[in-house]
Swiss-Prot record:
It comes from Citrobacter koseri (strain ATCC BAA-895 / CDC 4225-83 / SGSC4696). The gene is nusB. Belongs to the NusB family. The lineage of its organism: Bacteria, Pseudomonadati, Pseudomonadota, Gammaproteobacteria, Enterobacterales. Involved in transcription antitermination. Required for transcription of ribosomal RNA (rRNA) genes. Binds specifically to the boxA antiterminator sequence of the ribosomal RNA (rrn) operons. This is Transcription antitermination protein NusB. Pfam families: NusB (PF01029). One of its GO terms (cellular component) is cytosol.
Length: 139
Protein backbone atom coordinates (compact mmCIF):
# COMPACT_ATOMS: atom_id res chain seq x y z
CA UNK A 1 0.00 0.00 0.00
CA UNK A 2 1.24 3.48 -0.83
CA UNK A 3 2.51 5.78 1.95
CA UNK A 4 -0.24 8.27 1.02
CA UNK A 5 -2.86 5.60 1.77
CA UNK A 6 -1.27 5.05 5.20
CA UNK A 7 -1.30 8.81 5.83
CA UNK A 8 -4.99 8.92 4.91
CA UNK A 9 -5.60 5.96 7.26
CA UNK A 10 -4.01 7.95 10.09
CA UNK A 11 -6.08 11.03 9.21
CA UNK A 12 -9.27 8.99 9.27
CA UNK A 13 -8.19 7.32 12.51
CA UNK A 14 -7.76 10.71 14.20
CA UNK A 15 -11.28 11.67 13.18
CA UNK A 16 -12.82 8.36 14.24
CA UNK A 17 -10.89 8.25 17.54
CA UNK A 18 -11.96 11.82 18.27
CA UNK A 19 -15.58 10.69 17.85
CA UNK A 20 -14.99 7.59 19.99
CA UNK A 21 -13.30 9.55 22.78
CA UNK A 22 -16.20 12.01 22.96
CA UNK A 23 -19.06 9.53 22.52
CA UNK A 24 -17.63 6.52 24.37
CA UNK A 25 -19.59 4.38 21.89
CA UNK A 26 -18.30 0.93 21.03
CA UNK A 27 -15.27 1.28 18.74
CA UNK A 28 -16.76 -1.21 16.25
CA UNK A 29 -19.86 1.01 15.94
CA UNK A 30 -17.70 4.10 15.45
CA UNK A 31 -15.69 2.29 12.76
CA UNK A 32 -18.81 1.07 10.97
CA UNK A 33 -20.41 4.51 10.99
CA UNK A 34 -17.21 6.22 9.85
CA UNK A 35 -16.67 3.83 6.94
CA UNK A 36 -20.33 4.13 5.91
CA UNK A 37 -20.25 7.94 5.87
CA UNK A 38 -16.77 8.75 4.51
CA UNK A 39 -15.11 8.36 1.12
CA UNK A 40 -12.28 5.93 1.85
CA UNK A 41 -11.21 4.91 -1.66
CA UNK A 42 -7.70 6.33 -1.14
CA UNK A 43 -7.36 4.99 2.42
CA UNK A 44 -5.52 1.89 3.63
CA UNK A 45 -8.68 0.61 5.32
CA UNK A 46 -6.96 -2.36 6.95
CA UNK A 47 -4.46 -0.03 8.61
CA UNK A 48 -7.26 2.35 9.62
CA UNK A 49 -9.05 -0.57 11.30
CA UNK A 50 -5.85 -1.70 13.00
CA UNK A 51 -5.18 1.79 14.37
CA UNK A 52 -8.73 2.11 15.67
CA UNK A 53 -8.90 -1.27 17.36
CA UNK A 54 -5.30 -1.08 18.56
CA UNK A 55 -5.69 2.34 20.15
CA UNK A 56 -9.08 1.50 21.67
CA UNK A 57 -7.85 -1.81 23.11
CA UNK A 58 -4.61 -0.31 24.41
CA UNK A 59 -5.80 3.19 25.39
CA UNK A 60 -4.95 2.84 29.10
CA UNK A 61 -1.49 1.50 28.22
CA UNK A 62 -0.90 4.29 25.68
CA UNK A 63 -2.08 6.92 28.16
CA UNK A 64 0.40 5.50 30.66
CA UNK A 65 3.20 5.90 28.11
CA UNK A 66 2.43 9.59 27.60
CA UNK A 67 1.58 10.66 31.18
CA UNK A 68 5.18 11.12 32.42
CA UNK A 69 5.88 13.52 29.55
CA UNK A 70 2.75 15.68 29.69
CA UNK A 71 3.02 19.25 30.94
CA UNK A 72 -0.60 19.05 32.13
CA UNK A 73 -3.04 16.40 33.31
CA UNK A 74 -4.20 13.81 30.78
CA UNK A 75 -7.78 14.93 31.44
CA UNK A 76 -6.84 18.46 30.33
CA UNK A 77 -5.52 17.33 26.94
CA UNK A 78 -7.52 18.27 23.88
CA UNK A 79 -9.26 15.33 22.24
CA UNK A 80 -7.35 15.81 18.97
CA UNK A 81 -3.99 15.86 20.74
CA UNK A 82 -4.95 12.77 22.73
CA UNK A 83 -5.98 10.89 19.56
CA UNK A 84 -2.80 11.91 17.71
CA UNK A 85 -0.54 10.94 20.62
CA UNK A 86 -2.32 7.62 21.07
CA UNK A 87 -1.84 6.77 17.38
CA UNK A 88 1.86 7.68 17.46
CA UNK A 89 2.48 5.80 20.70
CA UNK A 90 0.61 2.77 19.33
CA UNK A 91 2.82 2.80 16.23
CA UNK A 92 6.00 3.24 18.29
CA UNK A 93 5.15 0.55 20.84
CA UNK A 94 3.21 -2.03 18.81
CA UNK A 95 4.26 -1.56 15.17
CA UNK A 96 8.02 -2.00 14.88
CA UNK A 97 7.64 -1.98 11.08
CA UNK A 98 6.72 1.73 11.24
CA UNK A 99 10.00 3.67 11.35
CA UNK A 100 10.59 5.79 14.45
CA UNK A 101 10.84 9.06 12.50
CA UNK A 102 7.77 8.25 10.40
CA UNK A 103 5.59 7.77 13.49
CA UNK A 104 6.76 11.09 14.96
CA UNK A 105 6.59 13.09 11.72
CA UNK A 106 3.14 11.75 10.87
CA UNK A 107 1.90 12.70 14.34
CA UNK A 108 3.24 16.24 13.93
CA UNK A 109 1.50 16.56 10.55
CA UNK A 110 -1.76 15.22 12.01
CA UNK A 111 -1.56 17.75 14.83
CA UNK A 112 -0.96 20.55 12.31
CA UNK A 113 -3.95 19.41 10.25
CA UNK A 114 -6.47 18.72 13.01
CA UNK A 115 -5.16 20.33 16.19
CA UNK A 116 -5.17 23.80 17.66
CA UNK A 117 -2.60 26.38 16.53
CA UNK A 118 0.41 25.11 18.50
CA UNK A 119 -0.67 21.54 19.19
CA UNK A 120 1.99 20.18 16.81
CA UNK A 121 4.65 21.68 19.09
CA UNK A 122 3.07 20.02 22.12
CA UNK A 123 2.80 16.65 20.32
CA UNK A 124 6.41 16.93 19.16
CA UNK A 125 7.57 17.73 22.70
CA UNK A 126 5.80 14.72 24.22
CA UNK A 127 6.97 12.31 21.52
CA UNK A 128 10.51 13.69 21.64
CA UNK A 129 10.70 12.53 25.27
CA UNK A 130 8.58 9.35 25.06
CA UNK A 131 9.87 7.83 21.82
CA UNK A 132 13.49 7.20 22.94
CA UNK A 133 12.16 5.37 26.01
CA UNK A 134 9.77 3.23 23.94
CA UNK A 135 12.35 2.58 21.19
CA UNK A 136 15.80 3.13 22.71
CA UNK A 137 17.55 2.12 19.47
CA UNK A 138 15.54 4.71 17.44
CA UNK A 139 14.49 2.28 14.73
Amino acid sequence: MKPAARRRARECAVQALYSWQLSQNDIADVEYQFLAEQDVKDVDVLYFRELLSGVATNSAYLDGLMKPYLSRLLEELGQVEKAVLRIALFELSKRSDVPYKVAINEAIELAKTFGAEDSHKFVNGVLDKAAPVIRPNKK
